Amino acid sequence: SSDVCSSDLRGGKTTLLRDIIRQLSNGEEKKKMPGVTVGVVDERSELAGSYQGVPQNDLGMRTDVLDGCPKAEGMEMLIRSMSPAVVAVDELGRKEDFKAVESVIHSGCKVIATAHGNSIEDVIHQPYFERLVRRRVFERYIFLDKGEHAGTILGIYDRNGRPC
Protein backbone atom coordinates (compact mmCIF):
# COMPACT_ATOMS: atom_id res chain seq x y z
CA SER A 1 0.00 0.00 0.00
CA SER A 2 1.04 3.63 -0.38
CA ASP A 3 1.52 5.25 3.00
CA VAL A 4 2.72 8.53 4.47
CA CYS A 5 4.30 8.93 7.89
CA SER A 6 3.97 12.32 9.52
CA SER A 7 5.13 14.12 12.65
CA ASP A 8 6.71 17.34 13.79
CA LEU A 9 10.48 17.76 13.69
CA ARG A 10 12.44 15.01 15.44
CA GLY A 11 9.45 12.72 15.65
CA GLY A 12 11.16 9.66 14.16
CA LYS A 13 9.76 9.83 10.61
CA THR A 14 13.05 9.17 8.86
CA THR A 15 14.01 6.34 11.22
CA LEU A 16 10.64 4.64 10.70
CA LEU A 17 10.89 5.10 6.92
CA ARG A 18 14.38 3.57 6.90
CA ASP A 19 13.09 0.52 8.82
CA ILE A 20 10.09 0.11 6.51
CA ILE A 21 12.34 0.28 3.44
CA ARG A 22 14.67 -2.42 4.82
CA GLN A 23 11.80 -4.72 5.79
CA LEU A 24 10.03 -4.34 2.43
CA SER A 25 13.29 -4.96 0.57
CA ASN A 26 14.47 -7.97 2.56
CA GLY A 27 11.06 -9.52 3.09
CA GLU A 28 10.27 -11.87 5.95
CA GLU A 29 10.66 -15.58 5.24
CA LYS A 30 8.90 -16.70 8.44
CA LYS A 31 5.84 -14.63 7.54
CA LYS A 32 6.00 -15.78 3.90
CA MET A 33 6.41 -12.16 2.84
CA PRO A 34 8.76 -11.97 -0.14
CA GLY A 35 11.03 -8.97 -0.51
CA VAL A 36 10.28 -6.37 -3.17
CA THR A 37 12.40 -3.91 -5.12
CA VAL A 38 12.51 -0.50 -3.48
CA GLY A 39 13.76 2.69 -5.11
CA VAL A 40 14.91 5.40 -2.71
CA VAL A 41 15.42 9.04 -3.60
CA ASP A 42 17.75 10.26 -0.85
CA GLU A 43 18.03 13.97 -1.58
CA ARG A 44 20.00 14.87 1.57
CA SER A 45 21.61 11.48 2.29
CA GLU A 46 19.52 11.03 5.44
CA LEU A 47 18.08 7.61 4.61
CA ALA A 48 21.04 5.69 3.19
CA GLY A 49 23.73 7.90 4.74
CA SER A 50 25.78 7.47 1.58
CA TYR A 51 29.49 8.23 1.57
CA GLN A 52 31.08 8.58 -1.86
CA GLY A 53 27.98 6.99 -3.36
CA VAL A 54 27.94 3.94 -1.08
CA PRO A 55 25.03 3.59 1.39
CA GLN A 56 26.26 3.30 4.97
CA ASN A 57 22.85 2.37 6.40
CA ASP A 58 21.22 -0.99 5.66
CA LEU A 59 18.20 -0.35 3.44
CA GLY A 60 17.84 -3.95 2.33
CA MET A 61 19.19 -6.19 -0.39
CA ARG A 62 16.67 -5.17 -3.08
CA THR A 63 17.01 -1.40 -2.63
CA ASP A 64 18.40 1.04 -5.19
CA VAL A 65 19.39 4.50 -3.92
CA LEU A 66 19.59 7.76 -5.85
CA ASP A 67 21.76 9.89 -3.57
CA GLY A 68 21.85 13.68 -3.69
CA CYS A 69 19.12 13.80 -6.31
CA PRO A 70 16.10 16.14 -6.11
CA LYS A 71 13.04 14.12 -5.07
CA ALA A 72 10.80 14.93 -8.02
CA GLU A 73 13.48 14.21 -10.63
CA GLY A 74 14.62 11.10 -8.79
CA MET A 75 11.12 9.62 -8.60
CA GLU A 76 10.69 10.09 -12.36
CA MET A 77 14.10 8.50 -13.04
CA LEU A 78 13.35 5.52 -10.81
CA ILE A 79 10.05 4.63 -12.47
CA ARG A 80 11.55 5.02 -15.94
CA SER A 81 14.74 3.05 -15.45
CA MET A 82 14.73 0.93 -12.28
CA SER A 83 11.25 -0.65 -12.19
CA PRO A 84 10.78 -0.56 -8.41
CA ALA A 85 7.68 -2.00 -6.77
CA VAL A 86 7.92 0.74 -4.13
CA VAL A 87 9.37 4.25 -4.26
CA ALA A 88 10.44 5.79 -0.94
CA VAL A 89 11.10 9.48 -0.27
CA ASP A 90 11.69 11.57 2.83
CA GLU A 91 9.94 14.88 3.55
CA LEU A 92 7.52 15.72 0.76
CA GLY A 93 7.10 19.46 0.61
CA ARG A 94 7.47 21.11 -2.79
CA LYS A 95 4.79 21.20 -5.46
CA GLU A 96 6.91 19.14 -7.85
CA ASP A 97 7.34 16.43 -5.18
CA PHE A 98 3.59 15.91 -5.01
CA LYS A 99 3.24 15.87 -8.81
CA ALA A 100 5.96 13.23 -8.98
CA VAL A 101 4.13 11.12 -6.37
CA GLU A 102 1.08 11.14 -8.65
CA SER A 103 3.25 9.98 -11.58
CA VAL A 104 4.68 7.16 -9.50
CA ILE A 105 1.20 6.01 -8.44
CA HIS A 106 -0.06 6.18 -12.03
CA SER A 107 2.88 4.01 -13.13
CA GLY A 108 1.66 1.24 -10.82
CA CYS A 109 4.27 1.65 -8.08
CA LYS A 110 3.51 2.16 -4.42
CA VAL A 111 4.89 5.13 -2.47
CA ILE A 112 6.16 5.31 1.09
CA ALA A 113 6.88 8.88 2.16
CA THR A 114 7.23 11.22 5.10
CA ALA A 115 5.89 14.72 5.60
CA HIS A 116 5.68 17.31 8.35
CA GLY A 117 2.45 17.55 10.33
CA ASN A 118 1.18 16.36 13.68
CA SER A 119 -2.43 15.55 12.81
CA ILE A 120 -4.60 14.45 9.92
CA GLU A 121 -5.92 18.02 9.77
CA ASP A 122 -2.39 19.41 9.37
CA VAL A 123 -1.74 17.11 6.44
CA ILE A 124 -5.11 17.56 4.76
CA HIS A 125 -4.76 21.34 4.76
CA GLN A 126 -1.23 21.55 3.35
CA PRO A 127 -1.53 23.24 -0.06
CA TYR A 128 -0.08 20.50 -2.27
CA PHE A 129 -1.02 17.57 -0.06
CA GLU A 130 -4.69 18.45 -0.26
CA ARG A 131 -4.91 17.25 -3.88
CA LEU A 132 -3.43 13.85 -3.03
CA VAL A 133 -5.78 13.50 -0.07
CA ARG A 134 -8.80 14.32 -2.26
CA ARG A 135 -7.65 11.76 -4.84
CA ARG A 136 -7.07 9.20 -2.06
CA VAL A 137 -3.54 8.48 -3.25
CA PHE A 138 -2.28 7.30 0.13
CA GLU A 139 -3.97 4.34 1.77
CA ARG A 140 -2.69 5.09 5.27
CA TYR A 141 -1.53 8.11 7.23
CA ILE A 142 0.68 7.29 10.21
CA PHE A 143 1.28 9.95 12.87
CA LEU A 144 4.17 9.82 15.32
CA ASP A 145 4.73 11.47 18.68
CA LYS A 146 7.75 13.70 19.28
CA GLY A 147 10.04 14.63 22.15
CA GLU A 148 10.71 11.92 24.72
CA HIS A 149 8.12 9.69 23.00
CA ALA A 150 9.55 10.17 19.50
CA GLY A 151 8.69 7.31 17.19
CA THR A 152 5.62 6.26 19.17
CA ILE A 153 2.59 5.88 16.91
CA LEU A 154 -0.13 8.35 17.90
CA GLY A 155 -2.62 7.24 15.27
CA ILE A 156 -3.16 5.56 11.92
CA TYR A 157 -5.83 6.81 9.54
CA ASP A 158 -7.23 5.37 6.32
CA ARG A 159 -7.47 7.22 3.00
CA ASN A 160 -10.77 8.75 4.11
CA GLY A 161 -9.23 10.21 7.26
CA ARG A 162 -10.88 7.69 9.59
CA PRO A 163 -8.91 6.00 12.36
CA CYS A 164 -7.83 2.44 11.53
Tell where the protein language model's regions lie, with residue ranges.
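Conserved P-loop NTPase nucleotide-binding/switch module
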Residues: 82-142, 146
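P-loop NTPase switch/communication element
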Residues: 25-78
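Conserved lysine of the Walker
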Residues: 13
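The conserved Walker
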Residues: 8-10
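Hydrophobic positions on the alpha1 helix immediately C-terminal to the Walker A/P-loop
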Residues: 16, 20
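Conserved P-loop NTPase
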Residues: 139-164
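Short, small-residue-biased leader/transition segments that mark boundaries at the very start
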Residues: 1-6
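Generic hydrophobic/aromatic pocket-lining and core-packing "Φ" positions
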Residues: 21, 75-76, 98-102
